[in-house]
C-alpha cells in the first residue's frame, strides 16, 4: 500500500522585469531567497546578480533588466513561505557602488502568473553628522546582510527612506499542497461565466 506524499513542492520561474528610480541611472540588482527552516531548495538558483541597465529613452524611462529567476522548493508546512529579497545598486557622484534600494515580497501562494511591484527603501543616517560623514567618505548606510529586509527583527528601530520600485513577474506551480490538506484557494471557486443566474 502506497503512502501519500510527505512534502509539497513550490516551483517558481519568472523575471525581475524592470525598475523605476527617477533620480538614478546605470543600476543593477542582486536577488536572494529567504525561507523558513522547514523549506529546502531542490533545484534552481538561490541568488544572482543582474547586468547593469540604463534608462530607456522613452517617456517612462524605466530601467529594464528582464533578469530570469527559477527555483523549486520542498516543504512539509507553509510556515516560513519563501520571499525574494532584491537589492539595487548603482554609482554615486564619485563612482562608488552604493545601495539604491532594498525590497522583499513573498512568493505568490496560488498557481499561475503573477506580477508584483516591490516598493524599495534605503537606510538613512540618524544624524546630520553621520549623514555628512557618510557622504564625505563615500560610504552610505547599508545592511551587512540584505536578507534582514525579509525579517521583522530590529526593523522597528531602522530609519529608512522610500526610493523607487521594482517589478517582478512570477509563474507559480505547486504540487501536493491539496493532498497534504493545504488550500490555496485556486480552482475551488466556480468560474463566474459558468455560474447559473437566478
Swiss-Prot record:
Q: Which UniProt keywords apply?
A: Cell projection, Cilium biogenesis/degradation, Cytoplasm, Cytoskeleton
Its BP terms in the Gene Ontology are: cilium assembly; smoothened signaling pathway
Where, subcellularly, is it found?
A: Cytoplasm, Cytoskeleton, Cilium basal body
Pfam families this protein is in? B9-C2 (PF07162)
Q: Where is the C2 B9-type domain?
A: 8-126
Question: Chief location of this protein?
Answer: cytoplasm
Q: Which Cys-Cys disulfides exist here?
A: none
Signal sequence interval, chain numbering: none
Would you identify the family this protein belongs to, as annotated?
A: Belongs to the B9D family.
Stored PANTHER family: B9 DOMAIN-CONTAINING, B9 DOMAIN-CONTAINING PROTEIN 1
- Role played: Component of the tectonic-like complex, a complex localized at the transition zone of primary cilia and acting as a barrier that prevents diffusion of transmembrane proteins between the cilia and plasma membranes. Required for ciliogenesis and sonic hedgehog/SHH signaling.
What protein does this entry describe?
B9 domain-containing protein 1
Amino acid at each position: 500500500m502506497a503512502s501519500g506524499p510527505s512534502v509539497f513542492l513550490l516551483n517558481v520561474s519568472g523575471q525581475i522585469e524592470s525598475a523605476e528610480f527617477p533620480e538614478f541611472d546605470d543600476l543593477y540588482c542582486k536577488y536572494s531567497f529567504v525561507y523558513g527552516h522547514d523549506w529546502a531548495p531542490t533545484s534552481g538558483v538561490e541568488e544572482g546578480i543582474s547586468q547593469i541597465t540604463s534608462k530607456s529613452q522613452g517617456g517612462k524611462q524605466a530601467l529594464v533588466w528582464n533578469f530570469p529567476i527559477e527555483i523549486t522548493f520542498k516543504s512539509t508546512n507553509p510556515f516560513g513561505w519563501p520571499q525574494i529579497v532584491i537589492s539595487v545598486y548603482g554609482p554615486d557622484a564619485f563612482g562608488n557602488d552604493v545601495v539604491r534600494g532594498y525590497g522583499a515580497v513573498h512568493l505568490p501562494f496560488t498557481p499561475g502568473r503573477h506580477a508584483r511591484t516591490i516598493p524599495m527603501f534605503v537606510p538613512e543616517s540618524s544624524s546630520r553628522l553621520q549623514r555628512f560623514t557618510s557622504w564625505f567618505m563615500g560610504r552610505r548606510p547599508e545592511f551587512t546582510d540584505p536578507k534582514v529586509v525579509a525579517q521583522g527583527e530590529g526593523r522597528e528601530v531602522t530609519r529608512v527612506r522610500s526610493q523607487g520600485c521594482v517589478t517582478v513577474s512570477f509563474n507559480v506551480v505547486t504540487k501536493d499542497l491539496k493532498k497534504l490538506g493545504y488550500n490555496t484557494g485556486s480552482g475551488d471557486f466556480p468560474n463566474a461565466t459558468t455560474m447559473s443566474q437566478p
